[in-house]
UniProtKB/Swiss-Prot annotation:
It comes from Leuconostoc mesenteroides subsp. mesenteroides (strain ATCC 8293 / DSM 20343 / BCRC 11652 / CCM 1803 / JCM 6124 / NCDO 523 / NBRC 100496 / NCIMB 8023 / NCTC 12954 / NRRL B-1118 / 37Y). This is UPF0398 protein LEUM_0652. It comes from the Bacteria. HAMAP family: UPF0398. Belongs to the UPF0398 family.
Amino acid sequence: MRLWVTGYRSYELGTFGDKDPKIKVIKYALHQTLKEQVDNGLEWVITGAQLGIEQWTIEVVADMKKDYPQLKLAVMLPFKQFGSQWSEDNQAKLQKLIAQSDFSESVSTKPFQSPIQLKNYQKFMLAHTDGALFFYDTEFEGKTIFDFQVVTKYQTQTPYPLVQVDMYQLQEYASELEEKMNENRYDY
C-alpha cells in the first residue's frame, strides 16, 4: 500500500523552532498512525516537503525504518527549485530530508510558473497512492483544504481511503504521550 501524507504547515499550527513541544506530540501522532498503517500493509509513504506535517513525516519515517526496514519513503516536489525562496537554514534542512528518502523527484520539470503545477501535483499524488493520511481538521482550515477538497471529490468516483487526524485526536495523542512520559514508557 502507498500512502499520501500531508497536513498543516508549521506556521498554521503555531510551532516555533524544532524544539516546540507541539512538534513532539505531532511526531508521536504520526508515528502511532503510521505504525498502524504499516501493520495493515503500508509499504510506501509518499509526501511532499512543505514545512510542517510533511517534513515531520519525513523525519518520523526515516526513524521508523530502523524498526521497519521494509518501509519506503518518497518525497515528491510539485516543481523544480521547490523551497528556493526559503531561508538558507530551511533550504539546507530540505536537502538533508530529501537525502533520507528512498526516492525523490519533482512532478513538474520546470520552476514554479502557475497554480496548474500544484493541481498536477495533486493528480500525481492521487494516481500514485492507494489512500491518504491527512493531519487536518475542517474546523481549523489551512492550506491543506485544497488537497482535502481534491481527495473528497476523487472519493466520489474512486474508492480511496482517507484517514484524518483532527485537533480532537491530536489532543488525545497529547494526553496519551503525557501519560507515557509520566510512567517512563515513552517509546518514541
